[in-house]
């Protein structure tokens, strides 16, 4: 990486999990964007979303690995997919970068335990 990279503000991509849901990905437990890695039918959607973030001005895209930690995968019954999901996230990010060689890829490194808990209440209950 060029040492001058940090001399100006850089734009990172947007909220991938929410964007994938907005584009039609069906939720799967608490996997969020990792569901797009787990389910082959969402791989193109994930790639296209990375590309759209780049076209919107992102100079850095983040791998969809925020929910691919072992504890989250175990909670969702797919702990055996740990290596596959993390490799697939890198592969799809690399595919997006291949169209835009100046874009950088950052790995999404989550905390190893819960960062938040979903609120199961309906809008009416809230």
PLM region spans:
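Domain-level signal for soluble alpha/beta catalytic cores
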Residues: 1-126
């Amino acid at each position: 990486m060029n040492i001058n990279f940090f001399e100006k503000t850089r734009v990172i991509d947007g909220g991938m999990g929410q964007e994938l849901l907005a584009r039609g990905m069906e939720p799967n437990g608490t996997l969020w964007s990792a569901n797009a890695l787990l389910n082959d039918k969402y791989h193109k959607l994930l790639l296209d979303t990375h590309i759209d973030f780049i076209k919107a001005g992102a100079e850095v895209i983040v791998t969809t690995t925020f929910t691919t930690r072992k504890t989250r995968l175990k909670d969702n019954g797919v702990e055996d997919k740990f290596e596959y999901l993390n490799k697939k996230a890198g592969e799809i990010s690399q595919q997006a970068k291949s169209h835009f060689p100046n874009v950088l890829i950052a790995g999404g490194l989550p905390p190893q335990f819960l960062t938040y808990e979903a609120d199961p209440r309906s809008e009416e209950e809230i």
